[in-house]
Amino acid sequence: MLDLNFVVQNLPSVIAKLEKRQQSFAYLNKLPLLAQQRKSLLLQIQNLRSQKNQSAKKVAQKANAKEDIALFLQENNFLRDDLQKLEQKLKLQEQEIFDILSITPNLPHDSLPIGTDDKDNKELYCEGQIRTFPFTPKDHVYLAEKLDILDFKRASKISGSGFVVCKGLGARLERALIQFMMDLHSKKGYQEIIPPYIINEKSMFATGQLPKFEDEVYKLYNSKNNWYLNPTAEVPTINLHREEIFKPGTLPIKYVSYTTAFRQEAGSAGKDTRGIFRQHQFNKVELIQFCHPQNSYEYLEQMLKDSEEILKLLKLPYRVVLLSTGDLGFSMSKTYDLEVFLPSYNCYREIGSISNSCDFQARRANIKMKNPKNNKNEYVHILNGSGLAVGRTVIAILENYQNQDGTITVPEILQSYLGTDIIK
């Protein structure tokens, strides 16, 4: 969430920056008047409280002196009623301000290319060699069904479209990737986390999923607790420290979190809905970091390298892309996408994102640090990154490591995890 005072004091530049996202933010022009009215109400309330306190003292003094207090009680009651009306008016005023700020996204970083969507993203560099096949490569669905390691038909019978059953070496490959990713990131100083998969409304708001993206998540409607299914490990892991203040010397704090994620994926169509590229339920390893504001962009670059190492060790060809302002996520100031080459698409497709939300999510979640220089509480910066999306990594392995006979060579780094060098 953006800071009200910052927005009001810098309104023209804030709107100009936000409109690089190719949306209109004219509604923010309401904020200066609302902020002024709020300030005026606060002063009136402060004055009335002072008058009410003075009136209460008079009542007490008159009562102690055995004098008639009827008129003073009446005055006190009038002041009480006026105060309640003003407090209610202030509550409505603050709710209107809150509602405006809660639907306003983060400011995009100045380094981002200006654009309308992913077509305007900027390729930074490519890594790895794209394989030249001596045969026509098959897609992951064909390969997996022939090997009987992914079962879409029975998953559809159980749950409907957008789900899969992993079987045999398919299940072992999924599990091996999760363990490999968790092991690698743990060695780099990330603490392992397996959080709850059911999340409350406050947690969803804190990371920016609510209220804007309610249609994209699953809500448990039979619950009295406003529970949601986890849409990404970012949500529960960041909320570990909601309403907390970090002591001096404790930052940065780094987590690697494994969860199953659940998303509606409404509006998805075409080739992306075939197979496991875009599922309602999928496994994901996520990196989260809480850090000092001065270091957040330095740590963003390191987190990118940490995620890249997974692809390098798996020897998968990939590229790094800087998201344009029009493709940038709601809560993020800057995002890199990792895109792996998929032969069936004959192009690079997203396998992970690494982002800096600066203090945007920290404000929504009220996560602060104690600054030892001035002993004041300040908002931390929060980074998150994929480390990686497991299902899409499975796709990349099946397609890039396929053989002409339909078998799959297991990447060398995974062979000890999987207990075999080939899937057949």
UniProtKB/Swiss-Prot annotation:
Listed Gene3D superfamilies: Bira Bifunctional Protein, Domain 2, Serine-tRNA synthetase, tRNA binding domain
A Pfam family recorded for this sequence: tRNA-synt_2b
Location in or out of the cell: Cytoplasm
Enzyme class: ligase
Keywords attached to this entry: Aminoacyl-tRNA synthetase, ATP-binding, Cytoplasm, Ligase, Nucleotide-binding, Protein biosynthesis
Pathway(s) served: Aminoacyl-tRNA biosynthesis; selenocysteinyl-tRNA(Sec) biosynthesis; L-seryl-tRNA(Sec) from L-serine and tRNA(Sec): step 1/1
GO terms under cellular component: cytoplasm
Molecular function via GO: ATP binding; serine-tRNA ligase activity
Entry binding sites for ATP: 263-265, 350-353
Catalytic activity: tRNA(Ser) + L-serine + ATP = L-seryl-tRNA(Ser) + AMP + diphosphate + H(+); tRNA(Sec) + L-serine + ATP = L-seryl-tRNA(Sec) + AMP + diphosphate + H(+)
NCBIfam families attached to this UniProt entry: serS (TIGR00414)
Domain commentary: Consists of two distinct domains, a catalytic core and a N-terminal extension that is involved in tRNA binding.
Family stated for the protein in its record: Belongs to the class-II aminoacyl-tRNA synthetase family. Type-1 seryl-tRNA synthetase subfamily.
Subunit note: Homodimer. The tRNA molecule binds across the dimer.
UniProt function note: Catalyzes the attachment of serine to tRNA(Ser). Is also able to aminoacylate tRNA(Sec) with serine, to form the misacylated tRNA L-seryl-tRNA(Sec), which will be further converted into selenocysteinyl-tRNA(Sec).
Protein name as it appears in the record: Serine--tRNA ligase
UniProt organism field: Aster yellows witches'-broom phytoplasma (strain AYWB)
